[in-house]
Design a protein with these regions (language model features):
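Short, small-residue-biased leader/transition segments that mark boundaries at the very start
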Residues: 1-5
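Active-site helix-to-loop segments that bind/position phosphate- or nucleotide-bearing substrates
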Residues: 9
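C-terminal catalytic domain of photolyase/cryptochrome flavoproteins
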Residues: 12, 16, 21-205
């Protein structure tokens, strides 16, 4: 197993679709987590990590969305102009195991964990020089938790670094070695993360 290949819903609350559109509130979720901790049902580290995601990262993203305003979604720091690759619409159109697995997750559930979203899908879009607005539109269409206020900062600011560093200090870009180290995808892939050129060279490398 690995961080990227853990079973689909293990260790994940799957609350983001409900939180992001306001069907439940952050306060309700945090209160429920605290009650479970107080009853001794969950360890402190799990409770703290979960609450940090809710009142830390989630609220930061919400603030970024409103602080930078409507123009933020149109930023394109690297002037990337390529259209979305066909593989983003069909898991059968790539031999890259990590990418195919992430796309299959979308096809099956309209959801994948944030790590493959960032380090596989977004990483590929950035390395392939995809136009940020194209990638943002796709993310908004395919993910069940894709509220506008969530996706605009996550894609423009973090995934594509299209804001030139207003939100994050550096682009989240990684090569095949990172994916190999953090997952078990590469062992069954036709591409070799250690090769940069040739037919078996990993596109991420």
């Amino acid at each position: 197993g690995s961080e990227m290949c853990i079973r689909d819903r293990l260790y994940h609350s799957l609350l983001s679709p409900y939180l992001n559109v306001g069907l439940i509130t952050a306060d309700e979720v945090i209160s429920a987590a605290l009650k479970q901790f107080q009853k001794g049902k969950i360890p402190l580290s799990s409770c703290e990590g979960f609450i940090r995601q809710i009142i830390g990262w989630r609220e930061y993203i919400h603030g970024i969305y409103w602080y930078f305003g409507e123009e933020y979604r149109h930023l394109n720091h690297f002037d990337s102009q390529r259209k979305l690759l066909p593989l983003f619409a069909d898991s059968q159109k790539t031999s890259m195991v990590c990418v195919a697995d992430a796309i299959k997750g979308i096809e099956k559930r309209s959801w994948v964990h944030h790590i493959p979203r960032l380090m596989v899908l977004s990483n590929l879009a950035m390395l392939a020089d995809i136009k940020p607005s194209e990638f943002l539109s796709w993310m908004r269409e395919v993910f069940i938790d894709a509220a506008d206020w969530v996706m605009v900062p996550n894609v423009v600011g973090m995934s594509m670094h299209a804001d030139g560093g207003k939100m994050s200090t550096k682009p989240y870009v990684a090569g095949g070695a990172y994916i190999s180290r953090m997952s078990n995808y590469c062992s069954s892939c036709k591409y070799n993360p250690k090769e940069r050129t040739g037919e078996k060279a990993c596109p991420f490398t």
